[in-house]
Amino acid sequence: MDIASLAFRTDLAMLEHSGSLVEHRETHLVVRTPDNPTYWWGNFLLLATAPADTGEVQGWLEAFEREFPDARHRTFGVDGTKGRRGDLAPFAEVGMDLDVSTVMTATAVHEPPRPNTDATYRRLESDADWQQQIALDLAGEEPATHDVDFVTARSEAERRLVAAGYGAWWGAFEDDRLLASMGLFTASPGLARFQNVKTHPDARGRGLAGTLVHRVSRYGFDDLGATTLVMVADPDYLAIRIYRSVGFADTERQLQAERKPSG
């Protein structure tokens, strides 16, 4: 199965770089993350096309259960570049949650309108830095969505990406306290993908994220040799305006459907 979606192509590259397995089928891909089986979007099916009706969705649910018999979640991606929420309607009809994300790209960047010059911007290096990254990742999140074990396992995968030389994780620090962070990694020659952009709830609205995105983007162009940077964003969340303010433009849409674990 050839993948058209820039978002899923870079998603899969990041997952494979950190140890996930991708199995190609004729009509779909099976993505597994053995080291983190509760990672919803590390253990999912990527479909070539959206299901036509609820009967087809039921078939995909059964396929998921065969591939992941111990999983409590159900997660499906749908390949493509210009899909719309309506394409996922059969998933909604069986009670699944839908997500349509905006895929953004940049071939050049500029400073945000109000850069933050008070913070120190640098790579995460020490164990203490990475412990702060785990705490930042958990800040403001619902425990049922992001528990300590899950976030710790994801952090370990992120450190493996850094250790393997694919890129770096960067942070904005004030008085050695991590207030914002993000990763940027090579997905394929000339293409780099941002990962898990996060600002502490108490530090939002101060220009940290925009300044950090700009600086990390320069790292991507200058050090990683990227010609195109990829960012996936929630179209309804304020952060998308921050990314646009430094030069990212809407390019594609990414379609996903999920059913969270019950209980």
Which residue ranges define each predicted feature?
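A conserved beta-strand-loop-helix scaffold within acyl/acetyltransferase catalytic domains
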Residues: 153, 158-198
